[in-house]
Amino acid sequence: MFRLSSKKKKQTVCSIPEFIHTMKESSDFSSYNIIEDGTLCLFYYKSTVESLIIKRFILAPIKDKLDEIRHIDDILNIVSIEDIIISPSIDDIREKLLGGYVLLQLKKGSEQEVYALLRAESTVLGTRLVNDTENEYSVIGPKVGFVENVDINIHLLRRNIVTEQLIFKELSVGSMSKTKIVVAYIEGITNEQHINTATQRLQDIDFDYPFDATMIEQFISDNSNSPFPILLPTERLDRSVYALLNGGVVILTDGSPYALAGPATLLDFFVSPEDYYLPWMAGSFLRLVRFFGAAFSLFSSAIYTAVLTYHYQMIPADLLGPIIYSRANVPFPPVLEALFLEITIELLREAGARLPTKVGQTIGIVGGIVIGQASVEAALTSTILLIAVALSALASFTTPTVKMSSTIRILRFPLIILAGAFGGVGLIVGFVFILAHLIRLKSLGSPYLLPLYPFRGLGTAEGLLRLPFSQTAGRASFLRPKKKWRYNPNKAKEKRDGEEK
């Protein structure tokens, strides 16, 4: 199908050579001189085209009949491509190059360059194009996940963010593996400080073989001794796209189905993409449930230990009797009782994770029931604590990010020990220590507790709640994006009201 460009729309204010120069900043943009002197060149995004189509149906016939090419129109009779656009505009080039076309440039002598667009779109890159988001499951919304091939992951991002401003910087990490690492960001939106920080830290890695993106995170972390994840690991495409559009940086690693999004904040690890696919009130409610679940999971066992060891006078009289009765035959102090049950829960969880899926689920359910019942009958623990620990384990599953869930489980143990040794004072000291540590943490140079500390008004409300889209037109100010607004809600409302009239 041959077409002349005849679209009448607002043109980009720049020349085609300048536009091509801008696109060359991305590592997945490729240029090829068919003729060595540069009179006939080919430009394309490797992540959107099929290399076999280019080699077999474009390059091979052109090289065989170079002498017959006098004008760009001669390409029509040479290549075996149906969809060709002659003399495209800059806007055509922007749209089509990002959609799987290649750009052919011809220059004869002192004549001005002429161009043609030829379709070479890739339909499938590799044997498996997308992965299922098993570890970040959502009931509503897309379930497209990354795979272990970084080129396919770049292709997925290109398909969802169709703009030449999406830039990919390719790096090589690992003295033995030469692992391909790609830093993705949106030019004109992402703050350059975040880009430079991520790039510099990746270049400074001196390691023989980084097997996974999570290893890369530990190398470029602001504090490698912190139990908290500094960058947000995600296998979800929509979550990575949102991070880029919001002014963040996404790091892709060849051989890993996970991307690293940053700068990340503590609140980011309790946000699920599903929040934005539900009505804002439902999304806000579920987010608050996650915050409560994380706090309950972290402190419930420690509070039980502190109250029964030092502060039993705080327990209401009606509740004190059942607690004394349930602990009447338990020979251990509350701190050992709590540690025993917490370790048992962790053993069941780890055993279930290492076994095949169906067997692991059975072990977790049956093992929990049998061991819990046997522990109560053997007077190793009380029924009250058994219920509290079971609810604590259940609450930990509400955290949508595996690494943050693991952090909460780890921190439970020192809090229980402090509560058993010093009571409520020890619990407060443990909380203050965690808070002080969080205040000092940074992600790619950005404070980890943002927008809670330093306080950021509407940004804080947006982190704690899922606000309506009409109130979230701006990008997160604490990321310091170059372009503040994602869209103008007032103009959108005016257009909608105009259509209704």
Where are these regions (language model features)?
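Interfacial segments of transmembrane alpha-helices in multi-pass membrane proteins
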Residues: A282-Y312, A328-V330, L347-T357
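Generic detector of multi-pass transmembrane helix bundles and their immediately adjacent loops
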Residues: I303, P316-I324, P331-K501
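Short capping/connector residues at structural and topological boundaries
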Residues: I34, N135, V144, H155, ...
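Membrane-embedded alpha-helical signal segments
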Residues: M1-F299, M314-A317, L438-K501
